[in-house]
Every structure is written in C-alpha cells, then in structure tokens.
Amino acid sequence: MASSTTEFVNINAKPITLTSKKIGTALDGCQFTVKYKNEVKSKLYLSFLLPAFFILLRHLNCDISAYYIFTASFLAISIYIEYCNVRKETVLIIPFVGIQYKTEYGFKMEKNHFIHWQTIDGVIINEVIHMHSIIYILTVIVKDYSQKTSLVTLFKNTKPRLKCLEIIYQEMEKILDNKTKDSKS
C-alpha cells in the first residue's frame, strides 16, 4: 500500500492535508482523505478559553443567575460548534464496486454515501461562482438506471483548492479510464 501526504490550503485559507493511498494491486483502488490540519489546536484553544471565561465572569461580580446563563450558553455554543465542524472527508474508490464518500464530524459522527460502479458516468472538476468568486469542486456524474443524470459533489465541506482537486481528479480519471477499457473488451 503506497501512501502519500501533501499539505494545501483550502478556499478559506485554512490549512488542510491530502492523504492518498493505493489499495491493493489486484483491485487497483485508492483512497483520498482531506482533513483540517489544526484539529488539535481548536480543542486546546477551547479548553483554555472556557476556564478563562468562567474566571472573567466571576471577577465581574455578575449576578449568580447571569453567571450560570452565560456559562450554559457558552457551553452550548461550544458543543454546537464542535458537533457541526467537519473533521475530514474521505473518498474510497474500488473499481467494479463503487465510490464511498464519508464525512466525519466532531464527536465521531459520520455520514456515508455510496455510488454504485455501474451508475458512474464520469468525474469532472466543476467551476462554480460562489459569492462573487470562482471556486472549483470535484463532481461525479451519475446516471441512474432510467438514464437520468445527476451530479454528486465531493469534498464540499473541506473545500480544497484546484491544485489539490487536480491530484485527486487525475487518479480518479485513471481508474475510470480502466473502467471504459474493460467494458469495451
């Protein structure tokens, strides 16, 4: 299993890491993981910020009920932010089986999506206008059995830049080219 890790910056200028792994020689599949680089720093920042907030409220001689309301609301907001933040996104490509797309959130919550191999029509890097700027997204073209075409966006939460997407695209295109060669023979 060959593995490589490359560091990039996403469209919001946050550091991300792309890890690509080759899976087996018989299947010739691969896995791509894009994750935020400073995951530990946010937890460390939150652990120092919370006690500082408690001490500040105590020294301001706030009413005790206001102290508990501020504390509870701060805890609720902190938990919500931790719960909703995407930690990493993974795309696993196994030829003749399909593409599994996994998004991991805080508190080990995951969402999985699967695209069957027979329904994959292609992969493209799509140019999108978003809030007065142009961003690039990696998209899988899916045709269902009734020949309706739909687009499935990959890495929509970590939002890697074009240079990162091109690396993933080239590997996916190699695998999909093998699919078309095998289906013709």
What are these regions (language model features)?
Residues 36-38, 95-98, 103-105, 119, ...:
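Residues that form ligand- and interface-recognition hot spots within folded domains
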Residues 114, 128-132:
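Extended serine/threonine-enriched, polar tracts that run as long, contiguous segments within proteins
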Residues 43-49, 111-117, 149-157:
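Short amphipathic beta-strand/extended segments with alternating polar/hydrophobic composition
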